C-alpha cells in the first residue's frame, strides 16, 4: 500500500462539526475532527471509493474536496455528500503488447500533490514521468502532461495551461 501524505481540516460552519478529509489508498475518508467518527453523510458512511489510489493531501475549495489520483487525474467531490462532481484526466491509459505480455504505458501521475490558489480557484499540480519508466522506446512522442506543471481552473472545470519540463 502506498503512503498517505496528509489531510485537510475544515473548520465548522453553522451547526456542522469540524471535519478532517484524507486519502486512504483507494478511498477518500471524512471524519469528525472532534470525536474521530465517520461523517456518515459523506459517501458511504464516511468513505468514498476511488477508482485509483490517492496518496497526497486533498484541498478544500468552496464546497468541494479536491484530490489527485494515480488514474492519473484531478477529481472534485462535494464535501457534504461525497458525490464526484467532475474530474480532469491527465493521461489516458495506453496498453501495448511486448513479447506476448500486456503493459500499461501511461504514467504522468501527480505524486507530489498540488497547490491551490483559493482566491482565483486554480489548482497547480506536478506530474512524474510517463509509464515504463526506464525504457522510453515503447512510449514515443511527447507524452502530454508527463513531467509537467499543469494549471486547472476549478471554477470553469478546464485546463488553463501546462508546462512540460523535459
Predicted regions and their residues:
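Repeat-blade elements of multi-bladed beta-propeller folds
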Residues: 2-27, 53-74, 102-138, 148
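Extracytoplasmic/lumenal domain signature
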Residues: 1, 13, 28-52, 74-104, ...
Amino acid at each position: 500500500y502506498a503512503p498517505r501524505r496528509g489531510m485537510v481540516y475544515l473548520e465548522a460552519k453553522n451547526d456542522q462539526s469540524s471535519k478532517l478529509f484524507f486519502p486512504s489508498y483507494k478511498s477518500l475518508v471524512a471524519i469528525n475532527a472532534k470525536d474521530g467518527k465517520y461523517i456518515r453523510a459523506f459517501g458511504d458512511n464516511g468513505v468514498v471509493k476511488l477508482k485509483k489510489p490517492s496518496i497526497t493531501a486533498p484541498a478544500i475549495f468552496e464546497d468541494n474536496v479536491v484530490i489527485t489520483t494515480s488514474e492519473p487525474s484531478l477529481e472534485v467531490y462535494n464535501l457534504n455528500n461525497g458525490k464526484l462532481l467532475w474530474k480532469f484526466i491527465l493521461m489516458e491509459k495506453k496498453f501495448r503488447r511486448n513479447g506476448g505480455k500486456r503493459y500499461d504505458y501511461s504514467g504522468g501521475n501527480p505524486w507530489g500533490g498540488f497547490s491551490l490558489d483559493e482566491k482565483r480557484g486554480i489548482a497547480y499540480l506536478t506530474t512524474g514521468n510517463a509509464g515504463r519508466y526506464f525504457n522510453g522506446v515503447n512510449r514515443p512522442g511527447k507524452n502530454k502532461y508527463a513531467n509537467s506543471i499543469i494549471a486547472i481552473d476549478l471554477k470553469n472545470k478546464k485546463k488553463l495551461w501546462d508546462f512540460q519540463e523535459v
